[in-house]
Amino acid sequence: MHRTFSKLAIVGAAFVVLIGITVLITGQPASKLRVQSASPHRVGVPDDWTHHHLVFSNPGTYEQVAKDPAAYAKWLTIHYDTRFILQQMKRHAEDAASPSGMLEPQYLAIGGLRLPPWRPIGPPRPGPKPKSTLKGDWSMDMGTGAKVGAGMYPAKFSFDTTTASCTDFVVYNTSVAGSSTQASIVAYDNLYSSCTGQVPSVYWAFNTSGTVRISVVLSPHGDQVAFVQTPSSGNAQLVLLKWAAKPAGRTLTSGGTNITNGSKTFTTTSGLTSMDVGAGISGTGIPAGDTIATVTSATAGTLTNNATGNGTSGESLAITADAGGPDTLTAVGNSSYPGCAGPCMTTISFSGTSRSDTISSPFYDYLSDTIYVGDASGGLHKFNPVFGGTTPAEVGTPWVGVSTTALSSPVYDGTHVFVGDASGFLYSVNSSGTATKSVQVAASPGIVDGPLVDSTAGHVYAFVAQDYNSTNSSTSPCAALNSGLKTVCNGVIQLPTNFGTTTQFTESVTGVGTTNTLYDGAFDNLYWTTNTGNIYANAATGANLPKLMEIHVTTSGFSTAACQSGTGLPTNCSAVQCASNIVTMTSAAAAGSPVTEICNNGLSACTSSSTDYIFTSVSGSGNLSTTGCATGNACVYSWVTTTALGASAAPTAGLVAAAGTSGIIIDNTVPSGTLAGASRVYFSTLSNGTCTTSGTLNTGGCAVQASQSALN
């Protein structure tokens, strides 16, 4: 399970992906790729923040590149990239469904030719109900003040992109300090309405003795997670965690020490674990509704309340499923981690002096088993190995000091790490650790969100709240929007991935400069299928009113006419184009979220006419009335973008979300006929709310699931 993820394994998996989806994406006949048939098991599909920041437009057909060695080499590199493989699995479900004669899709996933099939750790979950009434969305209380965080994402592990499973799970960080009653990180399974038992169920929850404010990433098989936490003192820490499922509801046998009236002590013949603390327990002499207070061994524990009667040795004790607080983990040494049995974790403190991390999420490279992450002092840290079975370690002290100000989340495209800083510069770092610094593209607060990289087109995008437009002329687009006054703009910056220190950038202006953070947008399905489409972004007016913006783009660059020129251009900028304002989403100042896109054409191919959704949220004062979210509220909205949106396009659905949402992730595009309650989105609220499926504990920050089609 912990083998090194070798280049051979990844290349093998990528090679097999050409069987099937290559026919659709590249035009290369499957018959040319002599690969043996696959075994019937499947390897799962992780989805975390990194899959929203490293993307791949259509790389073209085999015939288009076969006679050009350089183009062919790039074509192969793209097809061997794990995230390209996973992207194609999600967008071409008809092939992943494996029609007769095609290879099974498990080999389209990471390490498929080498890594063994993986099964959930812990007791199996029950299968789906034969018949079920759709329950709609769920929301679970993660604790007072708990949230994934603005611009941060939960992480989802699916065992298939075309068939939902009740063992699929989603992981949320909580952004509050862990304790015996508060999880630092929590996962839910039994996600879909047609699963039996409690929907959802707490799969596992851990107190890691720190605060996790940053997006988590998943290992290839989903059996480990990695994240950065802030401990009570000292530098930020990279945490590697092997999880184990909370014990299922079960019946244990009372041991030799009977339940005694007035005593809290009880024993069993076997079967207790530390994760039973807080679980419900019932039996003769145990007060109704009592819980387990402590577990001292596999056979001994204490009740929360004194027994009110006497039990007998050998009688049954019922333990409630999925109840109880988080399991508190104590970190093992780095050298002990590869061999430890879950649940266990290890920590690696960032090297350097006073190294904190407030906005940089770890980026995992599947091929080399490496994590890259930035810190608040401009250091770029590299950890290798991490999940692969040998002692995890940091490389360098740190690996590269690229800046002196806070770094964004880094994005690695297979050859270079791209990262922004709070001073408004982009950096490209090669494999030897040499950093290339761009021209300045943004003023304070610089580049907060990680770059968006289209590896196929060779473009890197930065979304900035205040560009480097301080010398705007009175004829600039932002001046026109600001009563003729000179002012900075907010917008999207584009540079080639091979930029140098003097390379000029292009910009698509999305509004007057704002104090809001401008998070990354998302390409629509038109861009993926035709190479000509749009980026949708949640930008803002100068008064901090979030607005949905449509940025016309091709694989060659921004595609609208220039709207700023001559002396009005920002320093080091070659062209400025203006995005289309679709609709202002609030009536008063509020904050926005990243934009997430999904083409959901069921088990059919995504074409330019397929149903395409985008999702984004506002933190309050929403002015777009929908069935699920009346005006005046903080709302998450969705639009169907099968064709480009026109001005004032109304959202197709909305849902109340206290103070807005974190980044939004997608599970699958499974038709309702295969498993009711699939094809969902996942996020957290950014403030306490009413978490409708959490019983009486329902007033904290909510982990939410909602439908893609109607947000219900």
Model-derived segments and their meaning:
Residues 11-22:
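Bacterial N-terminal signal peptides
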Residues 250-322:
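Small/polar beta-strand repeat architecture
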Residues 2-12:
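Bacterial N-terminal signal peptides that target proteins for export
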Residues 1, 27-28, 281, 288-294, ...:
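Generic low-polarity alpha-helical segments
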Residues 9, 34, 307-308, 312, ...:
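Residue-level detector of intrinsically disordered/flexible regions characterized by low predicted structural confidence
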Residues 21-124:
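Intrinsically disordered, low-structural-confidence terminal and linker regions
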